[in-house]
Amino acid sequence: MSFSERLLAAWYRGHPALALLRPLEALYRRVVNARRADFLSGRKPAYRAPVPVVVVGNITVGGTGKTPMILWMVEHCRARGLRVGVISRGYGARPPHAPWRVRPEQDAAQAGDEPLMIVRRSGVPLMIDPDRPRALRALLAEEPLDLVLCDDGLQHYRLARDLELVLIDAARGLGNGRCLPAGPLREPRERLESVDALLYNGADEDPEDGFAFRLRPAALVNLQSGERRALGYFPAGQMLHAVAGIGNPQRFFGTLEALHWRPIPHAFPDHATYSATELTFDPPLPLLMTEKDAVKCRAFAAADWWYLAVDAVPSPAFVAWFDARLEHLLAR
């Protein structure tokens, strides 16, 4: 287990040594609170776009199902007749310049794994740049849009936003409730009182303070051929190698077990890069990975490599709430 994996486990399961990091946590809290106060007070300017901006973000370190939820929002907005675009930091991307328009034919090293996955799945106009306001200006210069979704960026206060949605893993919650580096929180938990909605990934029903959503396995897709198969293609009891380089790989492995398969888990760091050698395991079995990992492996995939396509399914209450908020934002 790597240091980052051990630290993540300590944040969510508890460890007495974390008390040694509380002085650094106090400093971190002061810095992030002061930075947010500067933008809220107007001492530092924030870019206000001519179209509504919806931030879909995290308050915790680690995966919460943000990318599938953005894909759901893209399709939902399109079904309402809206022209929607996405901006992203492009974590791990190395484009020739920034801002950079992500295209389906690009590779993950250039575009970033999550932006490339979003574009290949949906075809949505998407611009990456660590400077979110610059990404948004560039996207609007190329596309006539009604609405922009900001992938992550909850803490990027240089970009004014009209709606803030925060995703939380229902099983892990906020961990020990402490800020970095003593805990997994990017901002103090009080920050959640000011966001517009909390969405709990994996909750069985809507909690009192937010909405539930789940990730529904949809299909098996072959990396080499693009062939799409129903989940029943792998029978119950099928042994397979399971690869996950995401924020919470155990959620992926648990999903495979819930489908009555027998995964041999291979967890990698979030946003990991791969080679064919790294993904050659014994015994020889089908290999199943996340869609986010698949965009980095298609060029060297073997014939029995697959990814599990998943769809976000929000609760009916959230869909109704989101539609009402969209109607309000677009009427202004």
Swiss-Prot record:
Binding sites annotated in the UniProt record for ATP: T60, V61, G62, G63, T64, G65, K66, T67
Enzyme Commission code: 2.7.1.130
Pathway: Glycolipid biosynthesis; lipid IV(A) biosynthesis; lipid IV(A) from (3R)-3-hydroxytetradecanoyl-[acyl-carrier-protein] and UDP-N-acetyl-alpha-D-glucosamine: step 6/6
Catalytic activity: a lipid A disaccharide + ATP = a lipid IVA + ADP + H(+)
Top-level EC class: transferase
Stored PANTHER family: TETRAACYLDISACCHARIDE 4'-KINASE, TETRAACYLDISACCHARIDE 4'-KINASE, MITOCHONDRIAL-RELATED
Protein name: Tetraacyldisaccharide 4'-kinase
